[in-house]
Amino acid sequence: MTQTIRFFLLVEAATFIIAALIHMGFFVTGYEHRQARVAESVIAGVLFGGLLLSLFMSDWTRNVAIVVQLFALLGTLIGIMTIIVGIGPRTVPDVVYHVAITVVLAVGIAVARSAPADSLQ
């Protein structure tokens, strides 16, 4: 179960890094957005930090994963709100990414919550 939780953290963090790079103008142009880039970079850093912490403190994996994914989910929901009110980027890829990563984060949280705390060492 520990490896599955870590896999979720790695994939989630990687997608936020890719999103931040896209909002920097890497890979494709026309999607630059400074505030989105900053938010995605912070979320990626928190998720990577949680992953690293789980590697060094494996008995903390479950709780750390829940906390960092909840943080990422909150940030994503704020991003969705900025799209709805018109301050965030409103492109189709942005909307699709926000919906998809919300689902992935929710599943990741459910997986971490379902893991027995004593089985993660």
For the regions a language model picked out, list residue spans one by one.
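Topology signature of small-to-medium multi-pass alpha-helical membrane proteins
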Residues: M1-Q121
